[in-house]
Amino acid sequence: MRKGKLPRKLGRTASHRRATLANLSSQLIIYKRVTTTEAKAKEMKRIVDKLITRAKKGTVHAQREVFKFVRDKEAVKTLFEDVVSKSAERNGGYTRVIKLPPRYGDAAKMALIELVDYSEMTTEKAVKRQDRSRRVKGSKKAIDEKTSDDSASVEAAPAAPEAEEKKDA
């Protein structure tokens, strides 16, 4: 039976594949979740799990080895300061791949890859966005009510000065 070979080729040359995975890995470390194709996400999972395991050593040599692949100072700093401290008690499986509906346009299989220890942070953001959309809807209603109240007061306002003129006469 035919078996798949790793690493996945991703339809790129070796240098392009390495650069793509390095960029995606650094973005995952910085933003804690990335939406990409399923094949890239699965390949990235292998790489990022190894990077986090290496970073848990905390040595200068480990920093240099991680930087050799990632090539982003901000990502390396975030990895060694935040990600490692949050996933210190975990022995592996630092990332999670969640399958998404196919991409519109070319129907490519899509997936969301995220750091497991940061998943509650991302759900809080979703709740905040939901609240914001409710406020926007509420403010639109408030604006509509306000404009209807203003138009009613404008109609009532000219009647009031006429009444005052009659009282003066």
Swiss-Prot record:
Stretches of Basic residues bias are at 131-140
The reply to whether Oxidoreductase figures as a keyword in the UniProt entry is: no
Q: Which residue ranges have biased composition labelled Low complexity?
A: 150-161
Molecular functions per Gene Ontology: structural constituent of ribosome
- Keyword Isomerase (UniProt): no
Q: Which residues form a coiled coil?
A: none
Specify the protein name.
Large ribosomal subunit protein bL17
Top-down, what is the taxonomic lineage of the species of origin?
Bacteria, Pseudomonadati, Chlorobiota, Chlorobiia, Chlorobiales
